[in-house]
């Protein structure tokens, strides 16, 4: 199964590369024609064509992120430092958004086994969704706590907005406790989206990163706020010595 999975993603990567090459040619041609013949910019069809090309390119970029979310190169990661680096990375990725960040996190150095690049892509998806829900100006809360068992840590991202349009009161999928919910599976299905003109890969990326990290994922709405939480196994001392 793993071999077939790797082969599938390899073929997808090749096909995506070829499609992106063709799209780059189309966009370059569109830009050249627009420059040589500025009078055609007033034609509605021409403007719609440019929007369509950009829209398809955006979809391909999103599928690229989804494809790479399957990769996993584990290493010891200081989760506390990682969380506090998120606002700066978010501001670089989304300079037009003015969200404030509030932290309520465990100040101890907590280590997990993770691929920092893939984990960052998952959290950027959650932060971006939280920002969009509050018109890119509201406050985003990042919370972390070590669970009662002492072996796991949960990180949650909360933003204003609800999931009322898909009407889940609460849902979760957590391999750590062997739980599942059909609605979570539906939301995490590639290209399923409640937004217009949306690629529908955000939660798919998050769910896949959680799966490769043996982490749990939960999502719920209460009192006009939506919270997404990820639960990680804490790296034990013996594991730290054996992790590169």
Predicted segments, located by residue:
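Conserved DHp (HisKA) dimerization/phosphotransfer helix of two-component histidine kinases, i.e.
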Residues: 25-29, 42-98
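Conserved HAMP-HisKA connector
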Residues: 1-19, 27
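Conserved polar catalytic motif of the HATPase_c/GHKL fold
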Residues: 124-129
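Short conserved segment of the HATPase_c
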Residues: 164-190
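Short beta-strand/loop element within the Bergerat-fold HATPase_c
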Residues: 137-151
